[in-house]
Amino acid sequence: MKKLYKAITVICILMSNLQSAQGATKSVQVPIRTEVKIPTCQLEIDSSIDFSFVKIEDIISSRATSKEANLNFRCDAHVDNVRIMFVPGSNRTSSDKRVMHSGTTGLGYSLQWSRASSGYSDIGFNTQYQWSDSDAYQNLLSGKLRLKPVSFPGESLSKEGKVSSTINIEVTYD
């Protein structure tokens, strides 16, 4: 019986060592770090719009020449749903939003916009327009802005002098 007891003891010891080897658990924590960034984008315009000298009668008769500027929207990564809006610095527009007030009585500017893939279209101020939709592009969108001096509706243009105005260009994207 002693031999049987010794044999059972040896078997139990071996089994307990085997179970503890199989049942051992080790854990290690793995650090995870992430930096989430919104793509950085820049809006570039190639020049200011300078009409120099314009005759009052050319503005009143709609014969004044338009001037244009190129716009580029560059991002360090692809962005979607790019929208653009032109906001007059004077915050005044005609009732149909097609003419911005210059800040000088009777003088305004009409606006046309062209995406790189299309021709010019008359557009309103203070309204968002789609710049990208299903168009394929590689982190760069191009467009053109065209302004023309015109009579501001409901006001008489009779005063001469230098005029400085601004347009704020707002671009929104996802």
Swiss-Prot record:
Intracellular or extracellular location(s): Fimbrium
Site annotation Required for stability and transport: residues: Y173
Keyword Nucleotidyltransferase attached: no
Assigned keywords, A-Z: Disulfide bond, Fimbrium, Plasmid, Signal
Predominant localisation class: other
Position of the signal peptide: 1-21
Cellular component, GO annotation: pilus
GO term, biological process aspect, one: cell adhesion
InterPro entries noted in UniProt: Adhesion_dom_fimbrial_sf, Adhesion_dom_sf, Spore_coat_U/FanG
Pfam family for this entry, one: SCPU
Disulfide partners: C41-C75
SUPFAM superfamilies assigned to the protein according to its UniProt record, in alphabetical order: Bacterial adhesins
Function: Involved in the biosynthesis of K99 fimbriae.
Name of this chain's protein: Protein FanG
